[in-house]
Each structure stands twice: as structure tokens, then as C-alpha cells.
Amino acid sequence: MKAPFTSLAGFRAVFETLPQVDAEAVEAATARNETLTKPKGALGRLEDLAIWYAGWIGDGRPALERPQVAIFAGNHGIAARGVSAFPPEVTVQMVANYRAGGAAVNQLCRVAGASMTVTELELDRPTLDFTVSPAMTEDELVAALAAGWEAVDDESDLLVVGEMGIGNTTAAAAIAAALFGGTAAEWTGRGSGVAGSALEAKTRVVAEGLELHADALSDPLEVLRCLGGREIAAMAGAIARARVGRTPVILDGFICTSAAAVLHALTPSALDHAIAGHVSAEGAHPAALARIGKEPLLDLGMRLGEGTGAIVAINILRSAVACLSGMATFAEAGVSGG
């Protein structure tokens, strides 16, 4: 679907009339769940997940058949500051790896039965160094938001967004600090594996960006423009498109959560259609999830990004939906006690 906005004002307007969860589907799913051949509440959180999914899909007996994993790749000007353990050219190399089917995300998509798309966002033209100037112009931000919006398959019934971009945990840390408050050190982690003096340098970069753009940080979209990256903006655009289309979303790690947090800062209901697939080993991720009110499904010590933790969670949600829709009721099974 072509993005319905050509400016940041147009993107903001999207959030003025967001669709709501289908209350009738929630009621039907809840009623069905109460009659299934199990003790009430015996499936724990799976029951809540299934009912949540039913409400956003709009079907009291839903199916999960067409999950989409949308990966966005962008390069960052701050990568030249040595904030990552890897050089900027790795972004392009990893995109080639995705297309060849050789990355972890490819294997996890196959196991989860998910389609995978990869959107490259001007990889030959990094964002600007946000310690010197805003990372993006307004037009560049709008283009990235639109690219994310248009990458969502209207036929999908679940969306996971992932990212590739050397330097993007630095941008995510800056976004989180700007939106949530606190110091650069509280939000800056090891990312690709930096430690010691390299981590100190990364933290200084975040602090410098926050100081330079202090006057702009009261506006979530200005936070994204000044401190973010094209792939982070595209993830926000994709999550917004899913919200408008009532497509459920599983959020991934710290970078994805920072993108989602921009939407949450615009209006908290912007993430009603989203759950957190996991909590990552990136140190600030638990705090970021708490700030947007999301409880993770998994804690596996993962810190790869690229949507991987959320993809692992797809089959948990699929299991929940299968139980709600596939189990027999007490009456159907002829079992006493219902």
C-alpha cells in the first residue's frame, strides 16, 4: 500500500484516527476459550496471546498462516566514529548474505514459515553524523517512513520487523535516552561487542548527540530525524502501517523497541497491536520495554537483532492460536466438566 503521507505532518495525522481492536472477535475468542477441553487458565499466557491475536485479526477463531518478516538496512554516519566492532561495509555484505539465504534470520524464517523481505535504504549514502548535524532531513525521514510503510504485505497476518545497519545500537541508545530521559551511559550498551575504551567512546557519541539536539528532543519525530537512521525510521513506518491495517506485530530487540518507542511517544495506543517477542542481552532493553509497557515472551540471551528474537516467538504465538482455534470444546468432545 502506498504511504498516505508526504510530510511529517501527514505521518502525524495517521495517528489521529487509529482503528480499534475488534471487540466482537475478542468476545467470541474469550467465550470459545472458556469452553475448550482444559481447565480454565491452564494454558497460561498462551490464552491471552490467542485472544489478543483474535481481536486484531478480527476473527474469534483465527489462523496464523502468513507471517511476514521485513528487514530494513541502512548506514549511519556515526559509524565512522568507531562505535561498532564492525566496519560500515558489513551492512552491504550482510544484505548480500540475506539474499543468499546464509544468515540466522533466513534459517529462523524457514522454521517459522515466514516470508522475508529485505529493503535497502540508500546504503551508498549514510545518514549524517548526529554529533555534527541532524542525521536526516525531513524529506529523508519521510522517505524512510514511507519505505517501511510500503514494505508491509497487505496479505500478511503477522509482522516482524528487523534491521541491519552498522552503528544502529548507538542511534537506538540516543533515541531511547531522548525519549525516556536519563544519561547516555544508562542507555548505551555493547551492541556488536564493543567494550572498555570503545564503549566509553560510543557513550560519548550518544552524549554529544543528545547535547547538540537538546532543543529538538521534545518532539518524537524530531528525535527520530536528528538521532535515528533510515532503517530505524523504516521500522517505525512499517509498525505504523500494521497498526492502521490491524495487523499484529511481534517486536524484536533494543533497536526495534527504540523505533516502536517513537510511535508510543506520539500516542501510546500506537502499539496496542504489538507484543514483545523477547528481551535481549543488550543492557538497556528491559528498561525500554518497561517504558512502552511490554512484557517479553522470551529471555534467551540473544543480541543479534535483525528480527531474530521476534521470529523465534512466532511459533509461540502460532501455538497459542492453534489451541484456541483447533481444540475441541467440552460439548464437541463429549467430555464432562465444561
From Swiss-Prot:
Keywords assigned: Cobalamin biosynthesis, Glycosyltransferase, Transferase
Gene Ontology terms for molecular function: nicotinate-nucleotide-dimethylbenzimidazole phosphoribosyltransferase activity
EC number, UniProt record: 2.4.2.21
Pathway this chain belongs to: Nucleoside biosynthesis; alpha-ribazole biosynthesis; alpha-ribazole from 5,6-dimethylbenzimidazole: step 1/2
Disulphide bridges, residue numbers: none
Active site annotation, chain numbering: 306 (proton acceptor)
Catalytic activity as recorded in UniProt: 5,6-dimethylbenzimidazole + nicotinate beta-D-ribonucleotide = alpha-ribazole 5'-phosphate + nicotinate + H(+)
Family: Belongs to the CobT family.
Descriptive protein name: Nicotinate-nucleotide--dimethylbenzimidazole phosphoribosyltransferase
Lineage: Bacteria, Pseudomonadati, Pseudomonadota, Alphaproteobacteria, Rhodobacterales
Underlying gene: cobT
